Structure formats: structure tokens, C-alpha cells
Amino acid sequence: MRCLLGLDIGTTSTIGILIDTEGGILATASRPSALVSRHANWAEEDTGLWWSNVCELVPDLLQSTGLEAVAIAAVGVTGMVPTVILLDDSGRPLRPSIQQNDARAVDEIEELKGRIDGDDWFRRTGGSINQQVVAPKLLWLARNEPDCFGQARTVMGSYDYITYRLTGDASIEGNWALEAGFYNLAQGGLDEDLVRLAGISPDRLPPLRASGEPAGAVTQQAAGETGLVAGTPVVTGCADHIASAFVAGACEQCDLVVKFGGAGDIMLTSERPVTDPRMFIDFHIVPGLYVSNGCMAASGSVLNWIVAQLGQGEAEAARAAGQSPHAWLDDQASDLPPGAGGLVLLPYFLGEKTPLHDPRAKGTLVGLGLHHELRHIWRAALESVAFGFRHHMDVFEEMDCGVGRVLACDGGAASDLWMQITADVLERPVERLLEHPGSSLGAAFVAGMGTGVLDDWSAIGRYARCDRVFEPDGSRTEAYRDAYGIYRDLYRRLETLYPALADLPAA
């Protein structure tokens, strides 16, 4: 039997998957990783932990299937984008990875805006200068960690780094360059002028490769550490949200995917690059397609924060009932009416990326009274993410992008309550892929297509199928429209206060 290995370098875990070539998922395994925030608005991860996770996952997957490593025909890697990893002359990371939702470089964003006209930037990149862009983070490093920055020989992203550790051959994938703000969409290829604006020379970026292109082969050293066979082909991977959209079945014009992870991704498939400064544009895994997309900096991570900081008693009650805290709180909040008893939450716990591009925005809860309970806050948080997705969908419609099917995936999609709220707020049916294997499957599939082991992009439908369709309930529509209007108005009213809050002393 030949199989394909997919690896996903995620925010909270590293995931591995083995699939066969007939639509079968042979095994999955994961190891925890940790987002570290040493200071306000910082988001970092340990690249060494990612690699050690990979070295543990491969033997686990092989052991659980009884397969030998020689059965693995190819490897693909996906991950968060655009993270920032600095390597020295020896290829060793100089510091922890700076994550895509890191919002430290507020001043540098404004500095960069002063160096290049925003319209010129948009014409080149199809996007705007925002907290996702890599250049401000590199400018921050040059200013605040000059010794480290001065030693940097190579800059790359998360899945590119693991690919490099496997093959010894450095490269960057197209979507890292595009979301980093270094890719000229009009001309095709890296824009050296934009790279220089970040304070680095273009030779600090490895060669650019498209998803599915050969990236090299597993080295003897990597084979010894991971248990893979030396010489196993490694294929250039892809951004995790794009892999996830592909696995969800978004392979046709106007397919919309909402991804309920730690962050909240929303992705619309198109046959041409439809751009807007408020949104991001990416290459689809399938050649010739594009993905107009947005990302809420925090969605599921807000729920995790509520459980960790406010829900200790509820967590104990959930354990006693044999439930997860999230499922228990869903049950408690399910009988509340739309609007969470008069509470509206803005989920800007890490600032906000699209469509606001405001790293100074803060998480906000409005409407609290002494009669409110944690279940009200919980429902307000669920509704806030749905409102955030509705905001993005409104922008897509302003861009003259038609929205067809709505597909929901990732961990948060397991919540029936959250899915029903989302269908009601979007006023559209939501198709859930409950058994969605995640981005790792997309990476494995790309590995198969890149090596010729697989030959049909549409065959992804054999691996992931719709679990349930949530129909919008018209009786809730008006109430949600009212609450959504308040949600949108709240940010406009508070926007001028957020910078003042940011200037207060940090804990």
C-alpha cells in the first residue's frame, strides 16, 4: 500500500495524517503546541517544538497503522501564514516565530504607510498595509532586537521551515509571499522594492515555489530524527486556511468556507483575483483558482479565554456531567433568545485583522447587568463570531462577489448551537463538515498531486463529506439583524478610544 503524509503546523497543535489513494484516512495524530504572549499584543511560538512534534508524530502514525515508512510515497506540509522565522547562517532559528496574529508592530505599520502610497501598495499586492503584513514586524525587529535581526540570513514561514528541516532546501510558498506583502500580484513574483521596504535585501528570502511543486527529498539527518525514509519526496505545501477550504470542498466559483478555529477564517473561491484593501487574496490549491478571504484574529480563542478565566465552576460542573466545558456552556446558553439577553461582545482580543485592520481594537462586552450569568456571556461570544463572519460576507457582496454554498469546518463547527446561530445570522443554509480532517489532509493531498500519486483534484470529495445542513430560522432573523447593527455601530463608536486604552500602562 502506498500512502501520503500530511503535516499541519497549527496554533494549538501539530497534526499528522496518513491517507491512502482511494479516499481512506488511515491514521491521525497530534501533539500540543503553545501560543505564547510575553507582552500585550505579542503572539509567538517555539519552532523547536514544532519540529520535535513532527519527529514524534511520524512514528506514532506508522505504529498505529502497522505500515513501514517506505510506504509513504510523499510528504506535504501546511501551517499558519504568514509567520516570521529568522534563521542564521547555519539555518538555526534566532528567536521564537512571530505569528500572523501578532499585533506588536503598530508604530511600524504607520511608518510603512508613510513610506509608500497605499494605492500603490494595493495595486502591487492586492491588499493593504496591516498587522498581517510581514514588513512592519521586520522593522520592529530591526529596531528592538538589532543583534538578532543583524544575524538573520533567511526569513521564512511556518510550513516552509518544517519543509526546510525535512529537505535541507529552503524555499517560500506563494501564499506566504502574498500574505506577507512581498508578492506583486500584477506582475507575478516577488516585488524586490517591497522587500527592501522591510529593511532586508531580497536575497534574504529563499526561492519562491508554488504549492504542489517539488521541494526536495527527506535528508539522511531528517530521516534519522523522524523515522521517514531518506529520499522520500517532499512537495511544497500550502497555507493552512487554503488547505482547509479545499478539504471542505470549496473548489468552485462562489463557494464560501467559514472556519471555526482559534482564529476565524472566511474564504470565497473565485476564478479570478478579486481584490479589496479590506481583505486578503490567496492562490487556491487548485491551479487557476483564487481565494478572496478574511481572518478574524480571535474567535475560538475567545471561548477558550472565557472558560479559562471565568468558567472554573462551569468546567467542574461539565466534568461531573461527562461533558467538555464548551458543550456544557452551549447547553446552558441554548435556550437564551437572540441577542444574549442584551449583551453584545466585540471579539477583538488580539486586535482585529480583516476587514477592520485595527491592531489597537480591544475585546469589548457591552450591556452587562447584575442579572447576567456566564451563559449570557458565552452566547454573546458565539454570536460575536457569527456577526464577524456576517461583516465579511457584507464586504464580499460590496466587492460584487456572489456567495453560493456556505461550508463550515474546524473544531468549533462541532457545536450545533454555534452552527445554528451562524445560519441565522448569515441568513443562509450552513453545511457542516463535522468529520473535516483539517488542513493536514489538504497537505497530504497536495503531496499526492505534486508527485503524480493522485491525479484528480475533485477526488478530495472522497475524504470529507457534509454532516448536516443548518437552515436559517426566519423567526430569529429580525432580532439578529438588530443585534448585528449594534455590533457594527459599537466599533464605530469605540474606535477613537482604543488608542487611548493602548497607551495605558500594561500589566
Where are these regions (language model features)?
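Short beta-strand-loop/turn "lid" adjacent to the catalytic site in phosphate-handling enzymes
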Residues: 64-100, 125-134, 163-184, 207-210, ...
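Active-site core segments that coordinate phosphate-bearing ligands/cofactors
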Residues: 5-6, 106, 113-126, 133-171, ...
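N-terminal glycine/serine-rich phosphate-binding loop of ATP-dependent small-molecule kinases
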Residues: 1-95, 123, 151, 223-224, ...
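Structural signal for short hydrophobic segments within the conserved structured cores
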Residues: 27-31, 206, 468
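Residue-level signal for inorganic ion chemistry
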Residues: 23, 46, 75, 102, ...
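Short linear loop/turn motifs
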Residues: 206-214, 319-326
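Short loop/turn motifs at secondary-structure junctions
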Residues: 68-71, 201-204, 402
